[in-house]
Every structure is written in C-alpha cells, then in structure tokens.
Amino acid sequence: RISGIGKAGNPDVQPNVDIVIGPGTEVVAGEGKIVTAGGIDTHIHFICPQQAEEGLCSGLTTFIGGGTGPVAGSNATTVTPGVWNMSRMLEAVDDLPINVGLFGKGCVSKPEALREQIEAGAVGLKLHEDWGATPAAINNCMNVADEMDIQVAI
C-alpha cells in the first residue's frame, strides 16, 4: 500500500523529513514512474480464472462485475444471477490472487430477490436496460441498495 509521498527517513538524524520510517518499512523508489496501489476493473465479465493473472500483469488488483464462467450469459452480462450462482462463483474465485466483488442482478420489482443476492455475498446490484430497467425495478433496486448500504451500477 502507498502510505505517503515525500522525503522519508529519521527526523532525529535528517533534516526536512516528511515521512517517518522504521526498520519494517519497505521503501520503493518511484522516480520517473507512475506508482499506484492497484487498479480496479469495475466492468468484468467473469469467464475464466486466467483473467486474474492477466489483470495482475496489467496492474489490476480488484475485479468487480459478474458472470458464471464460460457460458453465453457471462459474455452478455456483468452480473452473477441468483443465490445459487452467487455461492458457486464465490467458491470459484476464493483462491484467486486478486480481490473480487460480484454484482447481483438488480432489475426486479420485488425486494426479496435483491436482499437474497446481497445476503449471499453480492457487493452490489446491476441495473441494465436489456433486463427491463423499468421505473419500478430501478426504484426497488435503489431502495434496497440504500437499505442494505451497497452500490448500484447502472
């Protein structure tokens, strides 16, 4: 993690120290480089586990999206639909060397199905016009997200 930018050292023996460091501090020289704590892909179609390695190689540390693996639905959508699929996908991504958040499907007009997906582990809900983002569905999704303090992707 990046904890600071500036002149690091021991202020007892060096002048103008901005960041006090100790014997357990890892220092990375970043002159002339772009240094980031890690990128976040917020629109990932979970198709295969190899995506984690590809993401890490390009500086990503977090995937947020959805899918159920190598099926047509994952190509078309970035949600993991339903409690059963959410549970299976959470098991599948548990050992990946990357942070993962799964979206549940948000286009429903009754709140129970949304709550079930969140309780099963969804970090957020996704609304999409292809699934019937009617005013009632949008209102329902936003109300449940507010009630359960989660994000909505529209």
UniProtKB/Swiss-Prot annotation:
Cofactor, free-text remark: Binds 2 nickel ions per subunit.
Primary location: cytoplasm
Documented EC number(s): 3.5.1.5
Keyword check for S-adenosyl-L-methionine: no
Residue positions binding Ni(2+) 1: K126
Residues found modified as N6-carboxylysine: K126
Keyword Cytoplasm recorded: yes
Metabolic or biological pathway, per its Swiss-Prot or TrEMBL entry: Nitrogen metabolism; urea degradation; CO(2) and NH(3) from urea (urease route): step 1/1
Superkingdom in the source lineage: Bacteria
PROSITE patterns: UREASE_1, UREASE_3
Gene3D superfamilies on file: Metal-dependent hydrolases (3.20.20.140), Urease, subunit C, domain 1 (2.30.40.10)
Post-translational modification: Carboxylation allows a single lysine to coordinate two nickel ions.
Short name of one Pfam family: Amidohydro_1
Catalytic activity from the UniProt record: urea + 2 H2O + H(+) = hydrogencarbonate + 2 NH4(+)
Domain Urease: 38-154
Matches recorded under SUPFAM superfamilies: Composite domain of metallo-dependent hydrolases, Metallo-dependent hydrolases
The protein's name: Urease subunit alpha
Gene behind the chain: ureC
